[in-house]
Amino acid sequence: MPKGNGKVIAQNKKASHDYFIEDTYEAGIVLHGTEIKSIRNGRVNIKDSHARIDRKGEVQLINLHIAEYEQGNRYNHDPTRSRKLLLHRKEIDKLIGLTQQQGYALVPLKIYLKNGFAKVLIGLGKGKKKYDKREDLKQKQMKRDVDRAIKDHMR
């Protein structure tokens, strides 16, 4: 199955607005039992999260909010703890070199279930400037106007 396919649980639409996504990587997430149950219920928020490579060479997903499981008891998890991502060593080494360049960041694009496992699609993004964002909004509006005109003309 190609990367990014599966039942999408959460999607980060703000990432394409704030970053030029140059490359994507599929990674597994190390989770506790109540976390995967909350993810299956769709109670996850990736809007303000990002990934970082620590000194040990491990990729951590920071500020990912997975709500506590309702039926969980005292063994429930911390909602915003950092979670380890599972990638191949070659991919991590490549990401270390790329993220040390100025303006690059690792951004989670979506969380999905693939063969029963929770996966995250992380993108290597270069931050957009304010004028880039405005230009994208103009192009989006022009495309919407053209599509609307074509639809009206077809009637």
From Swiss-Prot:
Belongs to the SmpB family. Its main location: cytoplasm. GO terms for cellular component: cytosol. It comes from Oceanobacillus iheyensis (strain DSM 14371 / CIP 107618 / JCM 11309 / KCTC 3954 / HTE831). One of its GO terms (biological process) is trans-translation. Required for rescue of stalled ribosomes mediated by trans-translation. Binds to transfer-messenger RNA (tmRNA), required for stable association of tmRNA with ribosomes. tmRNA and SmpB together mimic tRNA shape, replacing the anticodon stem-loop with SmpB. tmRNA is encoded by the ssrA gene; the 2 termini fold to resemble tRNA(Ala) and it encodes a 'tag peptide', a short internal open reading frame. During trans-translation Ala-aminoacylated tmRNA acts like a tRNA, entering the A-site of stalled ribosomes, displacing the stalled mRNA. Signal peptide: none annotated. Residues 132-155 are annotated as: Disordered. InterPro entries: SmpB, SsrA-bd_prot, SsrA-bd_prot_CS. The keyword Iron-sulfur does not apply. It comes from the Bacteria. This is SsrA-binding protein. The keyword Cytoplasm applies. Keywords: Cytoplasm, RNA-binding. CDD domains: SmpB. GO terms for molecular function: RNA binding. It is found in: Cytoplasm.
